Amino acid sequence: LLEAATAALARSPGASMAQVAQAAGLARATLYRHFSTRQELFAAMRAEALVRAAEAITASRLDEGTPLEGLRRAVEALASLGVRFRALIVEGADLDATFLQQRAEVLAPLQAVVRRGQEAGLIRSDLPPEWVVIAMASMLVAAVRASADTGFGDGQVADLVFGTLTSGITPRP
């Protein structure tokens, strides 16, 4: 049910609950039995997005290869998730303190790989790892928002974000 609603909202982020139910092939009553309001649906989507992001980061094998290769894999995985959960980005998230703490925990492995890259001389050491991860996440959000207008797919979003990120974080000659 949540998967179907998420997919429907990815295609049409501003859809009403009735439109989400119809697009997902569900009866409106079925959707409302599980999520009585759009806010409840979005809260469930936020929780699911965090779980999926943690899984994607783990699956990115951050410790394999160079730190930049690990970051590249993470950006690719997170770009795909961003497109999938586009409605959360387009609508803006209701970011309470609990969500922000959970998001920080999910993103912590990325800060660790940035530190490893700094120690290896592959990432500028004058940039706080937290800032590099914030910049990466912000670019992903911006790229996913723009993808609806530009037609950029997951791969293009990942390429643009990673290219922009690495040109800013790698050591200057």
Segments from the language model and where they lie:
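Key DNA-contact positions within bacterial/archaeal DNA-binding proteins
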Residues: 29
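Hydrophobic alpha-helical connector segments
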Residues: 44, 51, 55-83, 94-98
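Residue-level detection of the helix-turn-helix DNA-binding "recognition helix"
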Residues: 22, 36-37, 47
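Short, amphipathic alpha-helix enriched in basic
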Residues: 1-23
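Residue-level preference for short helical/loop micro-motifs built around acidic side chains
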Residues: 19, 39-40, 69
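Hydrophobic/aromatic-rich alpha-helical bundle segments in the mid-to-C-terminal region
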Residues: 89-92, 97-100, 104, 119-164, ...
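HTH DNA-binding helix-turn interface
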Residues: 8-14, 32-42
